[in-house]
């Protein structure tokens, strides 16, 4: 039987899933490639049927990438998630990198459900790097939900402060990011890293008001992440700030990228001489 004959059987069948369920029918099809099989499945089965298909024993024995490609053809993100949440599901024998595309294909709400299921994460052998990567791809609101559960992060996932801070840095909405700084207990070392990712104006306000009780070298790092022109204006506007807080211009400039250091050197005469 050819691939064309198999297609004809599927066209005329009222129970297309049963055709794929019949191991002998598929085995009798000569030269049926993996690509042909995936195409037939995508053309003739709906999402829920594809879900059932991946639980058939002969389909669970297919090469890992073929199983992933079948799952990727399921349009409903919740159904794709269901495959991942199923104990001893069709991907339990695979390494994370083999079904990473499937993880990435989930929408944010489904990724959050998976991240909040520590048993499934363990069953899928998802390491901390994979968990961090998935968390970074969440929407800002879902990141907040995920990161706000401190006990779960610490006791179940055992995420390090470094990983948590990297996820917070990936938040796009500055207000959400600052709210997380108030909610998530972090060492100032990591808070400083996060503060370097916010807007110049907000950095200026935080440093001026010492909102997070930063030490001079930590404040210098945040100031050193400002744009050169903005920093020069900040220096000229708050001439007493540096001497009062034990911060030197040099300690800030060393945090500038090399290109910014050169730019600053060319503009140093724009700085109030009393501060220089």
Region spans (language model):
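Ankyrin repeat (ANK) tandem alpha-helical domains that serve as protein-protein interaction scaffolds
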Residues: 1-276
